[in-house]
UniProtKB/Swiss-Prot annotation:
<protein>
    <recommendedName>
        <fullName>Probable M18 family aminopeptidase 2</fullName>
        <ecNumber>3.4.11.-</ecNumber>
    </recommendedName>
</protein>
<dbReference type="InterPro" id="IPR022984">
    <property type="entry name" value="M18_aminopeptidase_2"/>
</dbReference>
<comment type="similarity">
    <text>Belongs to the peptidase M18 family.</text>
</comment>
<dbReference type="GO" id="GO:0004177">
    <property type="term" value="F:aminopeptidase activity"/>
</dbReference>
<keyword id="KW-0479">Metal-binding</keyword>
<keyword id="KW-0862">Zinc</keyword>
<keyword id="KW-0378">Hydrolase</keyword>
<keyword id="KW-0031">Aminopeptidase</keyword>
<dbReference type="GO" id="GO:0008270">
    <property type="term" value="F:zinc ion binding"/>
</dbReference>
<keyword id="KW-0645">Protease</keyword>
<dbReference type="Pfam" id="PF02127">
    <property type="entry name" value="Peptidase_M18"/>
</dbReference>
<dbReference type="GO" id="GO:0006508">
    <property type="term" value="P:proteolysis"/>
</dbReference>
<keyword id="KW-0482">Metalloprotease</keyword>
<feature type="binding site">
    <location>
        <position position="408"/>
    </location>
    <ligand>
        <name>Zn(2+)</name>
    </ligand>
</feature>
<dbReference type="InterPro" id="IPR001948">
    <property type="entry name" value="Peptidase_M18"/>
</dbReference>
<feature type="binding site">
    <location>
        <position position="86"/>
    </location>
    <ligand>
        <name>Zn(2+)</name>
    </ligand>
</feature>
<dbReference type="InterPro" id="IPR023358">
    <property type="entry name" value="Peptidase_M18_dom2"/>
</dbReference>
Amino acid sequence: MSNPVRFDRGHTDDLMSFLAASPSPYHAVTNAAERLEKAGFRQVAETDAWDSTSGGKYVVRGGALIAWYVPEGADPHTPFRIVGAHTDSPNLRVKPRPDSGAHGWRQIAVEIYGGPLLNSWLDRDLGLAGRLSLRDGSTRLVNIDRPLLRVPQLAIHLDRSVSTDGLKLDKQRHLQPIWGLGGDVRDGDLIAFLEAELGLSAGEVTGWDLMTHSVEAPSYLGRDNELLAGPRMDNLLSVHAGTAALTAVAAADASLAYIPVLAAFDHEENGSQSDTGADGPLLGSVLERSVFARSGSYEDRARAFAGSVCLSSDTGHAVHPNYAERHDPTHHPRAGGGPILKVNVNNRYATDGSGRAIFAAACEKANVPFQTFVSNNSMPCGTTIGPITAARHGIRTVDIGAAILSMHSARELCATDDPFLLANSLVAFLEG
């Protein structure tokens, strides 16, 4: 491949803004929706009847978003080209009774969401963000993006073996953040604080979905700014790339043989089994209703699904210079080497030979290099929404993503080239 596409500072700057502004899945879909609106997409409600008009549309349900672009004159049986991603990331989430404390410290009770690198949350300034449910049935987003919480590590003088035997954390006792002093802990203190922050009346908040986040901003790193450090790259990097790709394809308004789709799900990190997860009904419902809105039949629906393809885009593992032996000896994806194609013969990833050919063709069209990832046989392989999408909807699915280090850390690392290379490959795929 000659003169492949390289780093675009504008794309990566925008990714950094997107990461910083999206501390929860609810913020991520709101920010993605704003980008779609600017590109001419319009929101449709699941409770309304859908019309047959062409153009860009999207649905938001909680922390999930499905967006699609219908070309002028698209037949009911027109197949879909789908980019799948997820909006959630591992973190610490606030329990139903959050107010606690001990020995003169005020604390917040949290539960572990997904599989975070727990040590990365220690001694880090944390904010609080998410969604508040109000007495009148409405919801409000909240983002306390300043140092509010901290999980302090035990001093080495009280844990002399930590440097030789490794850090051992009890998930219940050792990860409850502090947020002040005082032994007088009252139920409702945290929610009263949030109500005051948002200018709400006392008692107006009756439910919440709240989570911690690092308040340190994303940043360029390295001698030549070749690296990008930031939170929630797994998997907002893919959500951002998918949004950019879909809006670019819609703006070009070329003669598309497929209907391009972005499916950004919640709850991937804990199994996808929810009404907003990939194992729920949302994607299938949206695709079916798109077919039926264009006067399609169940036969048209079957034809459309049979001809569709999904790229499940989720971050993957770049080879780690300090732990190269943890990777497969002959598959060492490099940071900066372009998107990775994920393969696993036990269907932990959905890629097969024909799927590889589809992605290779998209990368060739985009003049983007790609790499292949296979797990070391002695290490268990993770999974993605890819196999779920393939099994649930009968849609051919290919697992890909950008290569990063420190996956599931409060702060992850990638090469500055890779987000733009991924987005370009997605554009070529959606164009068909």
